[in-house]
């Protein structure tokens, strides 16, 4: 019988390091139809009259096994800073970089939240067909969808659907679901939403709860959480089930809305929905970024309600232990996984190898990498995507080259992406470009991920000109320019030391554009201004985030306070601002508040204060 207490038991303190999982959401649907001074402190154990309340003190139960380390995360108009860039300062060539496109891209984040739990493909645009004859890993084939192919070719959902109906073609649940699935894999969220909206307005298509959940997820991604909440009320009561609510919960995590996520979780309890491991995993992810003290409460809740950890839960725990450098604790979790009968697949093995490398245990990592390769690449070609970055991490260019040659002979989309990234880690830009070009030649319907993989290499090597040229190439190739592309450009300019131009590009992109930038895009600019002690611009970006409906959280306020600290400027009214935003400081934030307290007295001033 599994026990979360046993999983986390150890003599030392348990340090929950940040999870490697991004704050993102991925809809879980069936394939059949597919975060010492505080103002206030909450825990998570649920009770009906009070909702989420703390029932255990820091010394109760789980404190025997681990300690909890919380997350560390009106401008003066005269303080303009050095990074205010006038629009005319940009050259014509810079203005030529596309910042918008004809086809909306939607809010693009890493769509892989607890992916092993929700299902992940071993190749792009593939679906599971059947198990191999020897009873091994299921074989895959490319998901053929005429509707999807037509939409991508015409880049017009309305045109294709009108023609589709006129010709009397099938708009079955299976065809629509597969088209939505493939469009999601391309991050074409706006197109997915248009498809659902058109079906709802122009046909008698019978929507299932999973269909409504998919549409709600897309409304939140393309528009906002507020609009998603409005859409929720429009869903027929019979289809307003647990799947729909947990989809909204996942998007609250994506948007970093802690209070709203807790409200949704409580609402699901009030509606007497069973507490799912998916919902608990979402809260674990949320609190890993915003309030680590509550992580123990989630784990206690799972134990109290007999919710068995999923593979994704174990992934989270392994990442927490690994990032904290607790290799012994990580290995104890692995033992528990084995006791539970969960197979250590290549994905889990690659995560373990990654943390062995970080801990300097190169030989252990290499042993695991040999296990991952197993009987040979011909039998398990998909393991290249895990092995390539690992060999790059230990600087083994020979094995990276060996695997890259195999990838060339047996081109798979995911393996090619990993090869590009591996060569980037080794600073072999030309090799990465060569893999990219071969991928361009192979795929006619070319997703954005390879462009972003190559853009990341240009960013890390401060190759501004090449990065800009790549974005132009994306535009010329008909690739949708949207939030994810803006994010790549912003990172490129920030890394090159041009944060002012990065902000200007973002301002241009969002002008007259309904799509909003990603949370991480704003944070990249906010953090750079804060590092420079540019209070004015830091506050300006902070307000932009609020206007873009990104709720003020601990990490934003901590970054703003860092700007005041670096500028050696007192911050007036900061505590009141935080109270107004319902943000309560943890230990790290409280320390920063003390540093910028305008009424703080030094020891000498106290002596002379008579």
Swiss-Prot record:
User: Where is it predominantly found?
Assistant: mitochondrion
Recite the UniProt keywords alphabetically.
Mitochondrion, Repeat, Transit peptide
According to the UniProt record, where is the region Disordered?
88-142
Q: Where is the composition biased (Basic and acidic residues)?
A: 128-137
Location in the cell? Mitochondrion
State the superkingdom.
Eukaryota
Intervals holding PPR repeats:
241-275, 276-309, 310-344, 345-379, 380-410, 412-442, 447-481, 482-517, 518-552
Q: Which GO terms describe its cellular component?
A: mitochondrion
Q: Which InterPro entries match?
A: Pentatricopeptide_rpt, TPR-like_helical_dom_sf
Give the compositionally biased regions (Acidic residues): 107-127
Transit peptide located at 1-71
Q: Which GO terms describe its molecular function?
A: mRNA binding
What Gene3D superfamilies is this protein classified in? Tetratricopeptide repeat domain
- Family the entry assigns: Belongs to the PPR family. P subfamily.
Q: What is this protein called?
A: Pentatricopeptide repeat-containing protein At3g15590, mitochondrial
Source organism per UniProt = Arabidopsis thaliana
